[in-house]
Design a protein with these regions (language model features):
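Acidic donor-binding loop of glycosyltransferase active sites
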Residues: 184, 286, 292, 301-315, ...
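Acceptor-binding helix/loop patch of EC 2.4 sugar-transfer enzymes
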Residues: 8, 74-92, 135-174, 236
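Conserved acidic donor-binding segment of nucleotide-sugar-dependent glycosyltransferases
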Residues: 348-355, 363-368
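N-terminal subdomain of nucleotide-sugar transferases
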Residues: 1-63, 108-110, 421-435
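Short hydrophobic beta-strand element within catalytic cores of glycosyltransferases
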Residues: 319-322, 329-333, 349
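Donor nucleotide-sugar binding/catalytic pocket of nucleotide-sugar-dependent glycosyltransferases
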Residues: 62, 136, 146, 166-220
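Conserved catalytic-core segment of nucleotide-activated headgroup transferases in glycan assembly
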Residues: 199, 203, 208-302
Length: 435
């Protein structure tokens, strides 16, 4: 079938959880289906990133759209104006009339069998009017977004920020409920998320697919050795749950660890670290902040303990599966391991207070047989159960079933149409490339 895949960014560099999940899923789906990847484009990606897109799609359509940069005057002005909007800011900033028009044009041309909206944000550009979108639709939910905002609100101590986060949480809850009910099918990435959407939003056609990991890519190379007391955290540092996690770890957990192991070090790997974290690394030589790296594996290999101190989040944590495949000893909060079929004390250690988390990290750093046993069991689990091929096959079946159900409800011809491959470039309009 011909799938129109909606996104808010190109996938290269494949450097954060949502990109990793989509990239691996699409690479597998592309072998069985025709993929048109329609995305917003902030102009940062170059020719190489666009060329790389054909690893996961047959046609690339880029719609120019640049959200405000964080911490600028324009950014704060948008936050202020958003107080009067029914949409949460995380959705509002991706509204694009041009993307909406491109969706309508392609669907009405009869060249699309099924549309997949990847994350909640692109849904703001899916037309609401009856007849504008006459193909089956699937919403791919990597998280329950409202739950993330609820947890932000719950851990925030600043009164002004807490009020703002409360409003964003309630807006997101309303919007997410509406969107989940609008689509023909919703796909979650864990059974917990599926159940929450069923129970909280009253969504009937919601399914779940497991999280996968590329076990050929993520495996120990033997070229790097763990530093005895090195603790590693990886993740995009411009994602709010990761920002909160590393602040929590450096302020409340790391000092407790260093009381027992004074030479313990922390390596934070991930793009766009905030100024406060960079300033900490300048003042404290035991903290290393790398920023974006081309290959996270060598940093993971050097970890004697891999930590996931998340207090906020939803969906599942790809970073845990990657660390498991790398045979790392992992310490996580319950929220950090949420949605993953793994057991405390078997594949990792769970701890939900600063004191217990610090104690668990100290155990791993001091007890090498324990660390090795956790890493060995973790790697065996992901290699046996969580390859991307199996995950993509399940997602593909959900799409096929959604299309088949739609065909029984309509007499419209939704068979795949033959297309003429073409390439055009227009500075003010979408850039279309096909292979």
């Amino acid at each position: 079938m011909h799938i129109l895949w909606l996104k808010t960014e190109l996938l290269h560099p494949v450097d954060k959880g949502g990109k990793i999940r989509t990239y691996n899923m699409l690479k597998e789906l592309k072998g069985q289906h025709r993929i048109t990847y329609l995305t917003l484009d902030d102009g940062v990606a170059g020719v190489a990133e666009r060329e790389s897109a054909f690893e996961y799609c047959d046609e690339l359509v880029c719609v120019p759209h640049k959200p405000r940069e964080k911490f600028t005057a324009g950014f704060y002005a948008e936050l202020l104006f958003n107080l009067a909007s029914p949409l949460p800011y995380a959705i509002k900033k991706y509204e694009s009339a041009q993307m909406r028009a491109e969706i309508v044009k392609r669907v009405q041309a009869g060249k699309v069998d099924l549309m997949v909206c990847d994350f909640l944000a692109p849904a703001a550009n899916v037309p609401l009017k009856v007849g504008e979108v006459n193909c089956p639709t699937v919403l791919f939910q990597h998280n329950v977004e409202a739950m993330i905002w609820q947890r932000h609100y719950e851990v925030q101590t600043n009164v002004i920020k807490k009020i703002y986060l409360f409003r964003q949480w309630r807006k997101m809850c309303t919007y997410e409920r509406q969107m989940c009910r609008r689509f023909d099918a919703v796909v979650a990435v864990s059974s917990e998320d599926r159940e929450q959407m069923q129970n909280e939003y009253g969504v009937a056609s919601v399914f779940d697919v497991p999280t996968g990991v590329d076990t050929n890519f993520f495996r120990p190379s033997g070229n790097e050795h763990a530093d005895a007391h090195n603790i590693v955290f990886t993740g995009s540092m411009d994602w709010l749950p990761n920002e909160d996690a590393i602040s929590y770890f450096t302020e409340q957990i790391m000092p407790r660890i260093k009381q027992v192991i004074p030479d313990a070090t922390l390596t934070v790997v991930g793009r766009n670290p905030l100024p406060g974290l960079l300033e900490l690394a300048k003042k404290d030589p035991s903290v290393v902040v790398t920023g974006r790296v081309d290959d996270v594996r060598r940093y993971m290999e050097r970890a004697a303990a891999y930590v996931v101190p998340l207090r906020i989040g939803g969906g599942t944590r790809l970073k845990i599966y990657e660390a498991m495949a790398m045979e790392k000893a992992i310490v996580s909060t319950t929220i950090g391991a949420e949605g993953l079929p793994i057991e405390d004390g078997a594949e990792l250690l769970l701890a939900d207070t600063a004191e217990s988390f610090a104690q668990a990290v100290v155990r791993v750093l001091k007890d090498k047989p324990l660390a090795n046993a956790l890493g060995t069991r973790a790697a065996a689990t992901v290699r046996e159960q969580f390859g991307w091929k199996r995950v993509a096959e399940r997602f593909g079946r959900i799409c096929e079933d959604t299309l088949a159900l739609a065909q029984t409800r309509t007499t419209l011809d939704v068979s795949p149409a033959k297309t003429t491959l073409k390439r055009k470039a227009n500075e003010s309009g979408p850039l279309v490339e096909t292979r």
